[in-house]
């Protein structure tokens, strides 16, 4: 079980409600999560909420959020919250993974204190007694503005301000913020609480944002509380977005409703769609403290004298045109094939400078992509029309400070993966930054993130590409490998443990996600092992690269004994041991490998099966033996040749001697015969 412990000042709570009979889940040895007691008012669009009891301090009223595995928690917020000295923010107590008996799988949970009162609205469809201006200032704005100042000091955004995530204390009526940890910034927000440019994006690509985005959400919250209801309940997000683009956010959200005369100019100033026209925290604080209103004066927008028509829709402004072009990308590509759009901007919008910029979207520049495509050109034109809007490229829409979460969206939706890669390679982020009328506080950080993503995407090998972006840029995301089958790994040692469990059944888990997770989360570099795996020409080389990778990860991140993984790799790499020529060395290595199996250290196995020194010694001595064998063979052959030659010479000499002896004997016989006759 893995967890990160966070300190929290303990707040006494009333008795917990009665628990139902489902089996409780024990987290971190003390937190008893009650799956049978659901807390719907604390749940979010990506997480479930359950009553939780602290075994050591049962008087504390807690709850557990069970997270969506595919939506990363805000690790920076989880770690930073404990250092924010403000009681208007609920702070996490503990988070990590837990075995969840209800589902038979592992889950990620965050333990939090329950809010000290009810939500301002139980849902965005609910109604309530409208708040007076005095209540809004005293109970809502004063504590929340002070909280935002403290968070800004820690460079942390809230991005979760809305009536359903704000709670009113039962003892003094002051407002407390709910959690901000379960999902990326802005992910849980209804689109109406987001500025237009972020509302255009899917929740996961809305971006980190800054204080200006918080003030917009405060403005919408003031409107809802001032009316006592959501003025656009039942209106779809797309319809509301279209209204906001054409009418402005304030008019589109308020509609025919009326706000208190003292509140209306404040809300209007907070809901300006141009960020530089929106009230700052200082402006809002001045109104709260003095009551004086200095409403911002928006610059009049440029509206065409005749509309641009596209697919049955009309646009009178540059932003409207940018928006409708994204509704049919292929049709929009045909529109930019000639100068029709450019001429409309020049003549109908009377904006020659922008028309010139559109004409320059095609040529390659020093900071542009290596190759210009029609898709990149169209994306540039859309950004030129609406520079403060999100980047729009084919089917992908994102704010530049959401490159990290966008990688998850791309990796889980293969049709979007190519969009993400081409968007980064096309240097759309650079172009977007160039077109900003005013710098953003987060632009430098976003640029650094984009550079990281580009470096990983340039390598398509295992452990790189889109999967590497996913884990490098989202540090709280668990490994998304489908092969884990219900296991959750937030840290490398947890993934090693999961692999060890699966290895007990003879299954070796390894895929692009697992490789990228290890590469991103392990202290030290494993790029060499990953490249060796990619370049492997056979299964043995691939297995050795895998073994070296896992051994490195185990040595850096885990004290776990991996006997099952050790056994699997030893079986797979047995042919490598058998390939040693020296029988004594081969037997010695096999003996060492079996002896080390009890420790389950993969590094020990690496030293045995991938020992370059011993392999060279074996090869060198084999070559020496081979040369000696060749020399001895030559000597034997020579001796054999000399023996045959001597045998032939001996036979020849024997024949000669035999002939000579025969001659002598013949002479002697004749002599004896002659002498016998004479005598």
Feature annotation, model-predicted:
Residues 19-91:
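ATP-binding glycine-rich loop module of kinase domains
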Residues 258-273:
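Conserved C-terminal C-lobe helix
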Residues 223-258:
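Conserved C-lobe activation region of Hanks-type protein kinase-like domains
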Residues 131-145, 149:
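Conserved short alpha-helix within the protein kinase catalytic core
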Residues 91-134:
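Conserved structural core of kinase catalytic domains
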Residues 271-284:
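A conserved short helix/loop substructure at the end of the activation segment
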Residues 140, 148-170, 177:
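Catalytic-loop of the protein kinase fold
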